[in-house]
Structures are given as C-alpha cells and as structure tokens.
Amino acid sequence: MGCIKSKRKDNLNDDGVDMKTQPVRNTDRTIYVRDPTSNKQQRPVPESQLLPGQRFQAKDPEEQGDIVVALYPYDGIHPDDLSFKKGEKMKVLEEHGEWWKAKSLSSKREGFIPSNYVAKVNTLETEEWFFKDITRKDAERQLLAPGNSAGAFLIRESETLKGSFSLSVRDYDPMHGDVIKHYKIRSLDNGGYYISPRITFPCISDMIKHYQKQSDGLCRRLEKACISPKPQKPWDKDAWEIPRESIKLVKKLGAGQFGEVWMGYYNNSTKVAVKTLKPGTMSAQAFLEEANLMKTLQHDKLVRLYAVVTKEEPIYIITEFMAKGSLLDFLKSDEGSKVLLPKLIDFSAQIAEGMAYIERKNYIHRDLRAANVLVSESLMCKIADFGLARVIEDNEYTAREGAKFPIKWTAPEAINFGCFTIKSDVWSFGILLYEIVTYGKIPYPGRTNADVMTALSQGYRMPRMENCPDELYDIMKMCWKESAEERPTFDYLQSVLDDFYTATEGQYQQQP
C-alpha cells in the first residue's frame, strides 16, 4: 500500500531488569534495563510453572483445578445466580463464556458466577499483587494512577515469554519524578525463582515477602500492591435486545447533535452509559446490522457495547460507564487542564492502541475525535461510537457539507468523495492530537468549514502549536499527508507514541 509501517518493539530488553550491571534506557517516567541474557535461548518452563488457570478446561470433579476462590463478594441478581462472599470457595461445573456455573463448597448451592470475580485456588491469581493479562505499558499506567505511591508494585506475566513473569515497581527519581522499573523474574530448573542470582526462592510469594522486608538490591523496598479496582461484572448472559423498562436513566451527562448521554442502571444493579438517539437519526434495522459488528470488537481501549433497545424510538445504546466522561470535556475541566504533556502523549498512545486493533479487524471508525473518546477514573482512554457514523440518516450529516458533519476532523478524500478508510481515520487522529495538545480547542481556530475545505485543497495544514514538541507535530503532519497511502498505520503510530520519551543514550544501573 505504500504506507509507513513499523513493527512493535516487543523484545525481552523492554520487559525486565536483571540485577547485574547493564545499560539503561531512560524515558520520562520509566526506566528500562537491558537484559544481557536475552540473546540466550531459555529452557522451556515446566508445565507446573505455567501461569495457573491458562489450561482450565477439564471438568473432572476430582481435579483440584476446578476449585475457585472469590476475590470479591457478589450479590446475585437473577434467580439462577450464585451469591458468594469474598474468600468463599466454589467448584466450577461448567464454563459459559464470562459466566460459569458453580457450586459453593460451604452452602452447597449452585448457580452462575461472574468468572472475573474468582480465581483458581493455589495460584498466583489469588494474590492481590498479581495482575493477569496486563501489558508492560498498562502496568506502568496502573502504577502511575492516582492512589498509588512509590513502592507500589505488581507481578505480571511476560508479554514475550509465556510462563515467565516480571516485577514492576513504582519508584521516585529526583531528576525524572515518578518512574516505573521492571525486573525480570528468572526460573530455576528445579522450579525456583530469582531476580538476583545471589538469592533464590521456592515460589514467587516468598520472593515478594523477602523484598517487602528489604530492598536487597531493588530500587526500593516493595510496599503496597498496586491498586486494583473491583471489576465490573460481565454483562448478562444473552442480554442483547433488552426491554426499555430494564434501563433507569439517572443523570444526564451530555447532549449532542443526535441525542443525549445518560448515566443509568440496568436492572437497578449495573451502572451503564446510555446513549439515546433522536427519532429519525437512523433506522433500527441499519443500526442493528452495524451494532452486531460493533459488539464483536472487544479490546481494553474500546468502550464495550453491552446491549440495545430498538423496538421503538428513541433507540438506546447501552455501553460500559466511564467515570470522567468524554476526553474533550475532561481536557477542558480543572483536572484535565492540569495534566502535563507526558500524560497527554500517553492518552494519544492509548487511542492509537485502540485504533490499531480496529485496523487489524479491517474496521473503520469514521468519526474519530476527542468527543468520541471516553476517560475512566484511572485516566484510561477508550474509543467510543466506532462505526455509528455510517448509519446516520440525517440530511445535514449525510450531505457531508452539512452543518452537522465534522468537516474539521475529516480527511479531504472523505469530504469530497465519501471515501472513508482506515487512512481517513489516521487523518482524524492527527486532528485529535491537536485537540489533546491544546486541551480541547477547536481545530482550525477562526476558520469556517468552507474556509477549511478551500485551504486544505490548496495544501494548507495547521501550524505547530506553541506547547507542541516538534516530534509530535511531525507525527501530525504524517497523518495529514495528501495521499492516503502515505499516511502511517495505527500500529506504527502506537509504537512511536508508546516510546515517545525513550532516550537514545544508555545509562547504567549498578549491580547490588
């Protein structure tokens, strides 16, 4: 296609720290230490050391692997749910996606349980410091989130070497502020573990207890486990087209050209966001066809579509609730206006990650902008409203020159010829970067839509903003290439933004 491409830099060097003297690459908030043994082939990890729970398929009643313990309490909502207390043990009878049928070992009652509220007994998943299925970058985001401080830590599975683990620790550096340091946990042939070869441990739990007593060569002593918010329970089994009366609208969060957004509750129990569409915005049939595609797109950086109400107007779209609202509103708020550039870059990287997933799925957003990105309590960004623009039937929108069409965010080929592709989304992402770095200002300030269309046809591009680094502006200009095929991929954009602050000069961390 002629697009700029780049492979993600997922190598062992970026994943951990060895306790020997070795060169370090500094970032603004993170320190990565090269692993001098990364070019050596590691011995296969024995099955007994694989991440517990990964092969949880067999349902032999005699197997200990069927026993799970509750990480959080759960009050059942439906008659066939099984309520339980934190610490209660249950035997899994059947797995049904995100809901499992189980039997309490204490009460002997049976029912359905949310699978993300439990963990297999005698595994790392029962430990509050173990974060399953988390990337290195998201581990850094979690540790830097409000509520954590220096000494906060977590254990995660290595992204690059299945069955291996890494320790991530929040530290404070006078020159760089809060930083995250990653330590690779190595395995012994006999099943033990170590970070420094000076001292080994029979299990990871013993290792954690040791480093909670003294730093012993780590950047600092381990203190509290990284805060882990209680997960939202999985959506109800087979609840897609739901009754309107099952939704209670509680608080109006905002209003747009095509409807309103509310905080509400489903069945008086699950907090959700509800988008109510103005009558005539789109046909129920066209929306349902698109929604059936949208609900298959599931990623940490995409807002989860739960259910719909389409039997009569207004159409309701039920999604996961994001506490901080839209990125646009957040950037304009008192809290958002105090966010520093490194976090703004991180917002951009998170959005690029979500769009890279959409890119891999051969899908198109069509309306990517700060108003359609939502922010969580822990400042995680998720992309919303992907695909909806395709089924809007409003004449002022479909005309493309109409007042409701987002001209300033749209690529020239999409404005002029209706040619929407993932590359037109890349153009929009460049405009979104402008919104982020200006804390929510409208692009092309002082220009009308007509002025913008004329200027773009003559090669005009927005100039660099005063507080925008040259390197970030270079990324914007790449997104605004006239030829769609010359624009970068979202995979490339994610890799560049993830490593935006990576220094090129190596430093050294001394062996303890």
Swiss-Prot record:
CDD domains xref list: PTKc_Lyn (cd05072), SH2_Src_Lyn (cd10364), SH3_Lyn (cd12004)
Molecular function per GO: ATP binding; enzyme binding; ephrin receptor binding; gamma-tubulin binding; glycosphingolipid binding; integrin binding; kinase activity; non-membrane spanning protein tyrosine kinase activity
Lipidated positions per record (S-palmitoyl cysteine): 3
Main location per the UniProt record: membrane
InterPro entries from the UniProt entry: Kinase-like_dom_sf (IPR011009), Lyn_SH2 (IPR035852), Lyn_SH3 (IPR035748), Non-receptor_tyrosine_kinases (IPR050198), Prot_kinase_dom (IPR000719), Protein_kinase_ATP_BS (IPR017441), Ser-Thr/Tyr_kinase_cat_dom (IPR001245), SH2 (IPR000980)
All copies of domain Protein kinase, residue ranges: 247-501
Domain remarks in the Swiss-Prot or TrEMBL record: The protein kinase domain plays an important role in its localization in the cell membrane.
Family, as annotated: Belongs to the protein kinase superfamily. Tyr protein kinase family. SRC subfamily.
The protein's name: Tyrosine-protein kinase Lyn
